[in-house]
Amino acid sequence: MPPRPRFDRHAPERELPNINERISYSSLRVVDSDGTQLGVISREEALEVAKERELDLVLVSEKATPPVCRIMNYGKFKFEQEKKAKEAKKKSHQTEVKEVKMRYKIDQHDYQVRISQATRFLKAGDKVKCTVIFRGREIQHTALAETLLKRMSKDLEEKAEVQQSPKREGRNMIMFLTPRKTPLLKKESETTEPKKALRSIN
């Protein structure tokens, strides 16, 4: 029985960058590391210039005639590109909106479940749409729904900021919360009350 191959010979090769000796074109339009145009020169001459600069010759436009190369620090360039891609991905994630639905007569247990859901969404960097749903004549109790949403924003104030205060939207009342970017500064009265309580106990 023949030995099993150590790797799949038909598997696609990892895409390698077109830099230095991997560039096969005989003539190249070369841009120096400071942006200076070096004009159209031979591959060998371009490689020699890059070697003198202790940098890399990188193919940046293969479709041009002749192809365009730039002399640069490829390792630094690759790092910056990956950093920009990560930042772009992070920013795009923050645009998501998650929704938490409830009734204005919600009990304490279900309310805590909604608080936990909203907390999880906020920690993930998502905005939260808090929705109170009315059925039938319940629409008369918008004041109670507004009170509930304000209570929710208060309970989540350390993690969230109110982006849109409670307001009617059709047969619902909604409020938008966004992850808090700056720490919540507590009022002086809130920080001194525990100290007063300790003095009264002593």
Curated annotation (Swiss-Prot):
Transmembrane helix listed as a keyword: no
Any GO BP: ribosome disassembly
Cross-referenced Pfam families: IF3_C (PF00707), IF3_N (PF05198)
Domain of life: Bacteria
GO molecular function: ribosome binding; translation initiation factor activity
Locations listed in the record: Cytoplasm
SUPFAM superfamilies associated with the record: Translation initiation factor IF3, C-terminal domain, Translation initiation factor IF3, N-terminal domain
Name of the protein in question: Translation initiation factor IF-3
Species name: Prochlorococcus marinus (strain NATL1A)
